[in-house]
Amino acid sequence: MQKFKMVNHSKWVEMLGMKYWGFLLTMFSLMVLPAGILAEVGVDSRKIVLGTHQPLSGPMKNYAQIGRGASIYFQYLNDQGGIHGRQLFLLQRDDRFKPQRTLKLVEELVMKDRVFALFSGIGTETSESAMPLLKSQGVPHFFIGSNARRITEPPRHGIFSMLPTPEVEARVLGQYVNSNHPGEKVILWFRDEPEYKAASKEIAQKLQGNPLQFLPSKAGSSQFKAEWEAIQAGNPRAVIAIGPYAPLIKFLRAADVSGTPIYTGNALADSNLWRMLDSRIINRLRVLTSFPLLIESNHPGIRLHRALLREYAPDFKPSRWSIYGHSVAELMAEVLRRSGRDLTREGAIRSAENLKSWRGKLMPPVYLDRNQHLSMSFLRVSRIMPTKVVHLSEWLDGR
């Protein structure tokens, strides 16, 4: 005859009760913890922590104004309630523009300070030095301060750049010159370096209907007077000049004070241009612009920028680089805003990749997707005068 084991009724009831309360505790944890303990690294219910590497000291310390401009804008946002109720904190580290130092500091930001993301690190080699670490830890780097094509082409997951590449600038310049000098002879001066050789090909592609003469300037050469003599002998109706900032300025200083228009890139988009070049040469210049310039005093973004500096940093003189910092912070804030309250690194990357022709108070139109990780691809052709800027074109797409 089969024997049946007697069940302790009170123990069975107790066990069911424990399971019931355990179930309730689990459900409660799932509802509460995502805003705190289970949140993404660098995020809790009250704050988002970003990190950046900047040359806060040394010969490149002027770029430190970018980080300060960004911090001021974040402080302003925090006083408005932050992003989805969270305050923004930016941890700035001084890498002195040295890649080995950058890697050490980024490792501390990621492993010790546990930042949500890197934001607006300055420099190509400096930023590249930390990319293997960021990839291994799943940390994105939003809006690197570099104009190097290799940062975003081909696109890398979680890596976004800020500044227009020489190729982007070349497409815009070629597009504008083709429209405004149809069939006319153009001479293209460019520094004989890989990125500017590639850019010269982009210009040639846009100017297939124009007689085009190439004038490469050897790296390290300072024969700028002779180069201008060759340009004059060629008798062009327009000159395009592209190259790194330092040799480009020296080349322009050697130009005659009168002559055909000279088209150049975004490097010279500065309110202080009149201090660098003879005003008569500036009259010949057509420059690619992105952010509004300080002399555009009636621009809403410039008015806001000056007001924020008066409020939060009265000792801080506004500059091209403080505007840059404000602008890139505005872009970062938009990405975080679109990511929602349940903020994750992957969610922020997706939000960045879905910015379609977005514009801020200072930023030009931004178009990003999975294959386009370069933020500034829309530029305008402008004339910069001592007291005003005249925009000669609408926003032109350099993608």
What is the role of each PLM region?
Residues G42-K47, G51-S71, R93-P99, I122-G123, ...:
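Extracytoplasmic "Venus flytrap"
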Residues L109, D113-I122, F142-I144, K185-F190, ...:
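Periplasmic-binding protein-like
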